[in-house]
Regions:
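NAD(P)-dependent aldehyde/semialdehyde dehydrogenase
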Residues: 72-185, 195-206, 211-240
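Conserved NAD(P)+-binding/catalytic subdomain of aldehyde/semialdehyde dehydrogenases
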Residues: 1-87, 218-242
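Conserved residues at the C-terminal ends of beta-strands
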Residues: 18, 190, 214
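Periplasmic-binding protein-like
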Residues: 15-16, 186-188
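Short, polar loop motifs at secondary-structure junctions
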Residues: 19-23, 150-151, 192-194
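Generic structural signal for short, solvent-exposed loop/turn connectors between secondary structure elements
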Residues: 1-2, 31-34, 141, 171, ...
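Soluble or luminal CAZymes and related metallo-dependent hydrolases
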Residues: 19, 57, 61, 92, ...
Length: 242
């Protein structure tokens, strides 16, 4: 409704737009010179360092990942679709995927997946079929875990379809994330990796994602950055003292 849209923004000093890239571009064209804060299409990933694969930490790692994946059925921009797992003699990528599948199955008993939209049924079938050809796929009731190389990235249709990709470590992870660019919103990481990963992200001008602990990806702090900027940027102005 263009009339409602004009009434909403005509007296605004700045406008924040959440939506698809097409929606954001259309609003940018219609708003002219008015300051616009664009929050378009976004994706998120997770990273598990070797320390999180140790026997005493593995269960907590898997529970946290399962929660991040199951919350909102991966439909949000903070939902992890791809999990980078550091290669380790402690646990191979295929075994990690099997353990994650078990965790997703357990989580589904208390947090069941919503109904899969008919429009996504074919997309899910195609994603799973390609995953079986490329590497390995573990299917369950309402979820699937693929194991494949980290590049090129294949995004899932959401709804608890997730990829596990083995990597050498943080250096390779950051290299793999760079092509995702500004669409990358959040990187969940194990406690032993989150600080370093956050620092590395901050040094990459082509990335604006922030790092947070696994298990908290879907519950960001009120002041969590949006596309690398403070959430209040452009929306506040200093008051003049009387």
């Amino acid at each position: 409704d263009r009339e409602c849209e004009r009434a909403l923004v005509e007296n605004a000093d700045a406008v924040s737009v959440f939506g698809s890239d097409v929606t954001v571009a259309a609003m940018a064209e219609r708003l002219g010179d008015r300051p616009l804060f664009e929050l378009g299409h976004g994706v998120s990933v997770a990273y598990c360092g070797a320390g999180s694969l140790e026997r005493r930490r593995l269960d907590a790692t898997l529970r946290s990942l399962a929660l991040d994946i199951c919350a909102y059925d991966q439909r949000g921009c903070l939902s992890p679709q791809l999990i980078y797992v550091q290669r380790s003699p402690l646990l191979g990528a295929n075994e990690f995927a099997e353990r994650l599948a078990q965790a997703l199955g357990s989580m589904g008993a208390t947090l069941p997946r919503g109904s899969l939209p008919l429009a996504l049924g074919a997309e899910q079938a195609q994603w799973r079929g390609v995953a079986e050809v490329e590497g390995a796929l573990i299917r369950g009731d309402g979820y699937a875990v693929a194991v494949r190389p980290p590049e090129p990235v294949r995004w899932s249709p959401a709804y608890r379809n997730v990829t596990v990709a083995p990597v050498r470590g943080i250096d390779e992870v950051v290299s793999c994330m760079e092509p995702i660019g500004l669409a990358l919103k959040c990187v969940g990481a194990d406690p032993g990796s989150v600080e370093e990963l956050g620092q590395r992200l901050g040094r990459k001008p082509g990335l604006r994602a922030y790092a947070c602990p696994l298990g908290t990806m879907q519950t960001p702090a009120l002041d969590a950055p949006a596309d690398g900027r403070p959430v209040w940027e452009g929306l506040l102005r200093p008051s003049r003292e009387v």
